[in-house]
Amino acid sequence: MKTPKLLLLLSFVALHLDAQAAASSLSQILFSSNRSSAWRLWLVNADGTELKQVTKQDTDDQDVDPMFSPDGKSVLFTSTRAGKTGVWRMSFDGSKPERLCDGDQAEWSPEGKRIALRRNERILTRDLAGGTEKTVSPEDWPHCSGPAWSPDGKSLAFAARWESGNAIFIVPVGGGKPVKVYDKQGACEPHWSPDGTRIVYETETHICTINPDGTKNRVITYFGGVQRYARFSPDGKSLVFCQGASEQGPWELYVIPATGGTPRKLTEGGSDMYPDWR
């Protein structure tokens, strides 16, 4: 019995679409590593394949804390290029680097037209087109760090020194009174899930997630060592983080389900930190 031509055509289309889906699911993780001596930006597929170096300047400058732009065409990062720590932007392939401003720990807004950053222990937003800046954290709050845009672009999560330790807060992007989310175990480095329903953060030793209203706090990494700098996957189902035997490292990247589970090693060799996932 011959297979009808229409069924053959439909089967071919289905296989083609499956192949496209498999290719598109191969997401990438951008991170900073000292495996080439100075800290440089590197890229690896989320399955651990195709590791490659992105920034390759022949200097002792340090490139850290990278973040993909929302459209994936540019990268925001902190660098000591030009002799002073600042926020830089470049094309995804490492070309066309440009210094944007003083500061560090910069993060794109969801629409890609603004950034949030830290400068002199304050949290600011900056318009990329005109350079207009606005201080978001209260002027009398010391030691603010780690700004992170909410997916709807209306709020920023950040950490601040609070009483005997750190605490995580959320503040409207336009300014206002910050609302405390969590203030125990040195909580810092907050980052939102893609749907805005969870925030991942780090304590002195582990990675946790929590609702933005401070409820349903959950420890994700129960194992030994120290875990830092966690970020959600684009679909919100996984987390990438760096793991070290101690605060001195060396650090390696791991991936774990966002609800906890068995971690999978992603990189090894040198120290790998500050991952961002697209």
Question: Residues of each region from the PLM?
Answer:
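Bacterial N-terminal signal peptides that target proteins for export
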Residues: 1-7
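Bacterial N-terminal signal peptides
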Residues: 7-16
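Sequence signature of WD/YWTD-type beta-propeller architectures
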Residues: 20-278
